[in-house]
Regions:
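Short hydrophobic clusters on alpha-helical segments that form packing/core surfaces
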Residues: 159, 163, 179-180, 208, ...
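Alpha-helical bundle regulatory/interaction domains
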Residues: 1-152, 162-166, 184, 188-199, ...
Length: 238
């Protein structure tokens, strides 16, 4: 595999995880479906840029440049940018900003230094204080399965406005990613079907072809380079 990843969780109310990646060579990889908003720094031999990356509702093939480095802050679901609707960023409609000679980039009409992942929590707190990011409590409660003093339709509307996804699609993506992690960790296909609540192997396979871009068997064999996956635990109820 030509992409190598490292990551850590965060106790910040804004950050779900921070991760780094490095490519030892170039080539195509499968970018699997994902729910979270990310702030990604890309460093190549002749350039650097910062990307606000939105959710991905389906798997796709991406060409990876050789000898690249990436550092990213993955925000918790419910964290959004009020000036940049998440729904406009879906499926690689990302916003890219060049890094200037002084090592800064523009976001929300302000100049920012590149994030230091060792101090990502402090960096993100500053983003929040300046109004660049905000939390939507309704989305956070919906993920936990909490009762809310709102109609189901109101919750669904605010969930989609904040995340760019329906609550149902969010659950499908998280389930498929969790199933992928189980298979890569050595679980059998039948055990994975049972653990993640798919009806049967055919149901799992159909979901994987859309959201993961591979069959369960090819995931087990690790035939193809996949985008960043990590052990996320059991998806939230809903």
């Amino acid at each position: 595999m030509f992409l190598r990843f490292a990551d850590r969780p965060s106790d910040s109310p804004y950050i779900e995880r921070v991760w780094r990646a490095r490519s030892n060579g170039g080539g195509p990889f499968v970018s699997v479906a994902a729910c979270h908003l990310e702030l990604v720094v890309t460093r190549l031999a002749d350039s650097a840029m910062v990307t606000v990356r939105g959710p991905e509702t389906k798997a796709s093939i991406i060409e990876c440049p050789p000898d690249g480095q990436w550092a990213a802050i993955r925000f918790r679901l419910g964290v959004h940018m009020p000036s940049l609707p998440t729904g406009l960023l879906l499926d690689h409609h990302d916003v890219h900003q060049p890094v200037s000679a002084d090592g800064t980039f523009e976001l929300h009409g302000l100049r920012w230094p590149l994030p230091d992942l060792e101090n990502a929590e402090r960096y993100v707190d500053q983003l929040a204080r300046c109004g660049v990011i905000a939390r939507e409590q309704v989305v956070e409660a919906a993920i936990r399965g909490d009762m809310q003093p709102l109609s189901i339709r109101s919750v669904q509307r605010r969930f989609r406005r904040t995340t760019g996804l329906t609550h149902g699609l969010f659950r499908q993506i998280e389930r498929a990613r969790h199933a992928t992690s189980l298979l890569r960790d050595g679980a059998s296909i039948l055990d994975t079907v049972h653990e993640t609540g798919y009806f049967d192997q055919a149901h799992l396979t159909r979901s994987f072809k859309v959201l993961i871009g591979e069959t369960p068997a090819s995931v087990i064999r690790q035939d193809t380079q996949l985008s960043f996956l990590y052990k996320s635990g059991r998806p939230a109820p809903g």
